[in-house]
C-alpha cells in the first residue's frame, strides 16, 4: 500500500490522534481492517509483527467502523480529503480480501466518483499548499487506483 507512505502516519496513529480526528479515524480503521484480514488469511510475512496481537480484533470490526464513519461524506459540499479517498481505496482492497466483489465495486465507485467530482485526476486541481510528501502520496494513490480499476474491470 504505497499510498500510505507518509512518515507522519505511524506517529499520528501511535499518539492516538485517530480517536479525535474525524478525517483520520475512518482511514485508520480501514487500514486496520485490511491488515487484520491479511493476518487472518496468513498473507502477512513480516517477522517482526506480532500476529497473535494483530488477530485479537476481527477485521470486520475495523471494516464496519470505517464504513460507518465514512458514510455521509457523500453529502459534503467540500472537496474530498486525501484521507477520505484513501479510506475508500482501503475499503475496496479489504472487500477484495473478503471476496466481496460487489462491495469492492461500491468503494471503487465512490473513490472514482469523488475524484471526478473535484477533478482530482489533474494535479492542477489539488490543494496548492500541500508539500512534496502529500503530492507524492496523491500521485501514488491515483496510480494505484487506476491499476485497481483496470483489474476490477476484468472481474
Would you name each region that the model predicts?
Residues 1-155:
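Acidic, Ser/Thr-rich, low-complexity intrinsically disordered regions in fungal proteins
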